[in-house]
Amino acid sequence: MGIDINHKHDRKVRRTEVKSQDIYLRLLVKLYRYLARRTNAKFNQIVLRRLFMSRINRPPISVSRLARHMKKPTREGLIAVVVGTVTNDVRLYKIPKMTVAALHVTEKARARILAAGGEILTFDQLALRAPTGKKTVLVQGQRNAREAVRHFGPAPGAPRSHTKPYVRTKGHEKARPSRRANV
């Protein structure tokens, strides 16, 4: 007797191409697809995979977090590579000099990085400077920093659950339904 093999769950769930219609993003995908194929570097494969990702999976990273990553003594003179957005952080008083390659940098973050004597690269410039990812550090923002993530997890009433409930209001009058429904 043979075994009936169920192929129900066989497909690999991952993006194989970019979903966005942004022509500039598609050009970058073309470039990094070529680099991933022709170079033997894992770096290009990772960048390509991250270019495919949705906006939710490409979270922004603040200048302060970037500075904290690049301040380490082993990372001096390296290029910080962010497949996403670099945002400003007013809480950070002084920004160290650093080289950043990112998909997008906000106006204020750009001004502050350049004022500190730093440099901002685009991904096509990065491909010319470091085609195999030598002297680079891949960094990304926190994916679970979104407010929506607080609602995920075991049900809000369950024991040891810290999940945030979906409620319209905290007011006791509106939230509680009428008790006299069966009269």
From Swiss-Prot:
PANTHER family: 60S RIBOSOMAL PROTEIN L18 (PTHR10934), LARGE RIBOSOMAL SUBUNIT PROTEIN EL18 (PTHR10934:SF2). This is Large ribosomal subunit protein eL18. Residues 150-183 are annotated as: Disordered. Its main location: cytoplasm. One of its GO terms (molecular function) is RNA binding. The keyword Ribosomal protein applies. The lineage of its organism: Eukaryota, Metazoa, Ecdysozoa, Arthropoda, Hexapoda. It is found in: Cytoplasm. It comes from Bombyx mori (Silk moth).
